[in-house]
Amino acid sequence: MGLKAVHFGAGNIGRGFVAEFLHKSGYEVVFCDVMDSIIQKLQTTPSYKVIQVGAEGTSEDTITNYRAINSKTHEADVIEEIRTADVVTCSVGPNILKFIAPVIAKGIDGRSNDATPIAVIACENAIGATDTLANHIKGDHTPQERLDDHHQRARYANSAIDRIVPAQDPDAGLDVKLEKFYEWVVDRTPFSDHEPPAIQGIKWVDDLIPYIERKLFTVNTGHAAAAYHGYYHQKATVYDALQDPNILKEVHAALEETSRLIVGKHGIEAQEQKDYVDKIITRIGNPHLEDAVERVGRAPLRKLSRKERFIAPAAELAEEGKDFTALLDAAEMAFRFQNVEGDEESKELAKIMSENSAEQVVEKVCGLQSDHPLFPHVVAVVKKVQADE
């Protein structure tokens, strides 16, 4: 039997990032999704292209050796695939993990204890996403008496992924355009008694937290800050936003604040972090990505939440008595991202802002309590935005 990976979420990250490396590593990829249209396309198209764009030009890979299953209508088939697979990966969005957990749990439960445990790796933009998935699988969907030897059937490894996938050409079909740069870091510790799965592109580490926080508080903070400042100043793309010296200065300032936190907390060298920041600003300002500010800014409620790219680092800096002004400025711009066409959360944000006091907004949206040192500062920002409306 050849190697097989089951991947949930046949969107751009799934097809363009995860499946590309699985394919290059010799895996047959079985895509699972609930979108009829994408499943039908994959079932009737024997190959698609992954196009990497960088400052130095474009390259492409052809992806073959995959199948596709509608997990809504063919659950039994998905369970059978997981029962005989080597790896399960997913890129469905952090809020969807609970919905894919039941079918994965059934697949794992049907596995032999004598086979190598299946490796489960969630590839989501969230800290500890595989843990979240594992908790749903083990906590909600695995019989109590099957938990003791569950580790003989499955191992769960958290991961940090970093690759910018812009909005795609509507006529591209299954082809995916993304940036050349990537980072895929996965926790090695669950595989202490056997080799982790051989997947090209993965960097295996014993401590993932520095990588996750560095990525979230640099790439995600910088990307979103550029988008929200850009949207407020009526720029079309992140590239356009970063051509404005004032916006560029704001993004740099926010990343100087998060860099102070990252260097102090994780012992990363200051110069190494500075080089990382410079590389990130070049990446998010890649003119070939044509990334609309509305797309990068979408889901402002999630992006303003407690563990996310602005409030999490600002809260830690406030606790340490350090400067967080630029992060607060970026958060202000996120609060102004309201009633944006095609983005439900921006409409919900507008409703919350109009129906609540500033204090209630900060508790509700940012998850901050009134005794936190950051709380009054965010309240002041919300009051300012509310006054302008």
Swiss-Prot record:
This enzyme catalyses: D-mannitol 1-phosphate + NAD(+) = beta-D-fructose 6-phosphate + NADH + H(+)
Residues engaged in binding NAD(+)? A5, V6, H7, F8, G9, A10, G11, N12, I13, G14, R15, G16
- Asked if the keyword Metal-binding belongs to this entry, the reply reads no
GO MF terms here are:
mannitol-1-phosphate 5-dehydrogenase activity
Q: Does the keyword NAD apply?
A: yes
Catalytic residues in the record: K215
- Provide GO CC annotations from the record: cytosol
Q: Which HAMAP family does this chain map to? A: Mannitol_dehydrog (MF_00196)
* Similarity comment: Belongs to the mannitol dehydrogenase family.
Q: What is this protein called?
A: Mannitol-1-phosphate 5-dehydrogenase
Native species:
Sclerotinia sclerotiorum (strain ATCC 18683 / 1980 / Ss-1)
